[in-house]
Amino acid sequence: MSRFSLRLHYATGRTPDDEPLDALDEVEARELARMRLLLTRDYSEIELRRGERRIDAFQRDHP
């Protein structure tokens, strides 16, 4: 297992929160980050990070 984190950017503009994420590799971590974004409408963007390095980011599609 590798340790990643998700930086959760709120749609309301509230200060982002960091949430730990354990995944087998970056591929699994990306899939879990996408799923996390889809689970709630609270977030406008989720960054996938390893340590201080941003690996990827996913934004919510706006209608």
Task: Identify what each model region corresponds to.
Residues 10, 25, 49:
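Short, acidic, Ser/Thr-enriched surface-loop or helix-capping motifs
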Residues 39-63:
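Short, mixed-charge low-complexity intrinsically disordered segments
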Residues 14, 27, 61-63:
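Short, charged/polar surface micro-motifs in flexible loops or helix N-caps
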Residues 1-16:
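Short aromatic-glycine-(Arg/Gly/Cys) micro-motifs in beta-strand/loop hairpins
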Residues 16, 31, 56-58:
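Short acidic, gly/pro-rich beta-turn/loop elements at beta-sheet edges
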Residues 13, 28, 53-55:
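Generic "edge-of-domain/loop-turn" microfeature
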Residues 24-42:
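A short, charged, amphipathic alpha-helix used as a generic interaction element across diverse proteins
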Residues 14-24:
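A short, exposed loop/beta-hairpin motif centered on an aromatic-Gly-Thr core
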